[in-house]
From Swiss-Prot:
Stored PROSITE patterns: ALDEHYDE_DEHYDR_GLU (PS00687)
Induction / repression: By the monoterpene alpha-phellandrene, but not by acetate.
Gene name, Swiss-Prot/TrEMBL: geoB
Keyword entries, A-Z: NAD, Oxidoreductase
Alphabetical list of InterPro entries matching this protein: Ald_DH/histidinol_DH, Ald_DH_C, Ald_DH_CS_GLU, Ald_DH_N, Aldehyde_DH_dom
Protein name: Geranial dehydrogenase
Catalytic activity: (2E)-geranial + NAD(+) + H2O = geranate + NADH + 2 H(+); perillyl aldehyde + NAD(+) + H2O = perillate + NADH + 2 H(+)
Effect of inactivating the gene: The deletion mutant can grow on acetate and perillic acid, but lacks the ability to grow on beta-myrcene, limonene, perillyl alcohol and perillyl aldehyde.
Organism: Castellaniella defragrans (strain DSM 12143 / CCUG 39792 / 65Phen) (Alcaligenes defragrans)
SUPFAM superfamilies: ALDH-like
A GO biological-process term: monoterpene catabolic process
Active site positions: E252, C286
Family of this protein: Belongs to the aldehyde dehydrogenase family.
GO MF terms, alphabetically ordered: geranial dehydrogenase activity; NAD binding
Length: 478
């Protein structure tokens, strides 16, 4: 059964798009048609931005305090929760995320995130009186930045939408969302939840389409801030556009994270964590630790342990509960990953995988492990975004840190050791926005983001609300 959407959600209503073009959505595991949606044009995007601007002027939204916004966020969370299974299944069909992962990260985690920001909104301090050294008083306000243009990637389409929507709404902004063209069906489920929750018209608008309308959104005169998650190359283009406009932007971009395995590491713990820390979502996670740094004295042991684990992973349909690694999100991306694997066979020693799977249909690649990898090689330096691990030898902890930091990226990382305090000492030396000790899982109460070519700004945590606010000082002089 296919799902055919004819309308878009703009201004709190389901309206017919001006564009007559359509986009087909395929099942990543079977290549079968699962749905179609409008492919919107710039005129459709203009209507969405206008609706968001009207919401910023309307007392139904602009007139609410933090407690009022919190009530809307909680109702939205409840409506999303009722659609949890539908959301998870939708994502798994479209991008190949194993259903067990989608249940957690594209459903349960998203609901928790909305409720977390509802709590923050409820206790938000939006104005404070500060005494001046001159004897007067100044009111310092934190106002919403205005209309936010949010551009969403295909790898975690629900979670990364809510990473932006929840803090923006908590701050009092209105949002125009441009989902990835490959994962659109889930955005319709979120829009249905927003409608059921009774969010004021124009507070959230969803406009599906290609990169052209995304560019139009970024440079639109009615947009006050841009939030983007995606590739570093696209992020640079967006950063340049926002710089010309002096428009604030949050960018969460690529990564090539390192896992530093120390001499005293518990290898069993490392192996248990690999599906989350290194192969999550079939390797299609920006923070994945795909460079495994192993000490020379335990190098062969680490290689054998990882090879044994990865070779046993069940590869199959994303909706199969037994699947550990599903397909890539598209045929083009599968081909890109496969090219990197072929490149790697000339740069390093292939230990596991290296080819396509036995499936007749679907965009699958074999989980692959390379050993004897030089950190200067392309497979160690470029983001592959697939289930491909590179194991790199180091001679001492200083060299391990040096190798980990020798990357244009700096988003994630892990340190593996039975000495917790020492692991934290190593983590402090890593040039990256986030580091996990003996595992990796972003914390919704802590800022998430990268350094260097992995982006600018932070999402998650209370800090994220500040990204959607601007300061105003009111001098009380008489």
């Amino acid at each position: 059964m296919t799902i055919d959407h004819q309308h878009i959600f703009v201004g709190g209503q389901w309206i017919a798009p001006k564009s007559t073009q359509r986009s087909n959505i395929l099942n990543a595991s079977t290549e079968e048609l699962v749905g179609s949606v409008p492919k919107c044009n710039n005129e459709d995007m203009d209507r969405a931005v206008a609706a968001a601007r009207e919401a910023m002027r309307s007392l139904a939204w602009a007139g609410l305090d933090g407690k009022g916004r919190a009530q809307h966020l909680r109702r939205f969370a409840d409506a999303v929760e009722r659609r949890g299974q539908q959301l998870a299944r939708s994502v798994s069909l479209q991008n190949g995320m194993p259903i067990n992962v989608a249940d957690q990260l594209e459903s349960a985690f998203v609901v928790s995130l909305l409720r977390y920001y509802a709590s923050l909104a409820e206790n938000l301090v939006e104005e404070e009186a500060r005494p001046s050294p001159t004897g007067s008083t100044t009111l310092v306000r934190r106002d919403p930045v205005g209309v936010v243009g949010a551009i969403i990637p295909w790898n975690f389409p629900v979670a990364l939408s809510i990473f932006k929507i929840a803090p923006a709404l908590a701050a009092g902004c209105a949002v125009v969302v441009k989902p990835s063209s490959g994962t659109v069906l889930d955005s319709y489920v979120l829009a249905e939840a927003a409608a059921e929750a009774g969010l004021p018209p124009g507070v959230i608008n969803w406009v599906p389409g290609d990169r052209g309308i995304g560019s139009h959104l970024v440079s639109h005169p009615g947009v006050d801030k841009v939030a983007f998650t995606g590739s570093t190359s696209a992020g640079r283009i967006i950063a340049e556009a926002c710089a010309r406009l002096l428009r604030p932007v949050t960018l969460e971009l690529g990564g090539k994270s390192a896992a530093i395995v120390l001499e005293d590491a518990d290898l069993d713990a490392l192996i248990r964590s690999l599906p989350m820390s290194s192969v999550l979502n079939n390797g299609q996670a920006c923070f994945s630790c795909t460079r495994i740094l192993a000490p020379a004295g335990r190098y062969d042991e680490v290689v054998d342990a990882i090879a044994g684990a990865v070779s046993a992973y069940s590869v199959g349909d994303a909706l199969d509960r037994a699947t550990v690694v599903g397909p890539m999100a598209s045929a083009a991306h599968r081909d890109s990953v496969q090219r990197y694997i072929e490149l790697g066979t000339g740069e390093a020693r292939l230990v596991v995988g290296g080819g396509r799977t036995s499936q007749d249909r679907g965009w699958f690649v074999q989980p692959t492990v390379f050993a004897d990898v030089d950190n200067r090689s392309r497979i160690a330096r470029e983001e592959i975004f697939g289930p491909v691990l590179s194991i790199i030898r180091y001679e001492g902890e200083d060299e391990a840190v040096e190798i980990a930091n020798d990357s244009e990226y700096g988003l994630g990382g892990t340190v593996w050791s039975t000495d917790h305090d020492h692991a934290v000492t190593i983590a402090r030396r890593m040039e990256t926005g986030t580091v996990g000790i003996n595992g990796y899982m972003p914390d919704l109460n802590a800022p998430f983001g990268g350094v260097k070519s992995s982006g600018m700004g932070r999402e998650l945590g209370p800090e994220s609300i500040g990204a959607y606010q601007r300061y105003k000082s009111v001098y009380l002089l008489g």
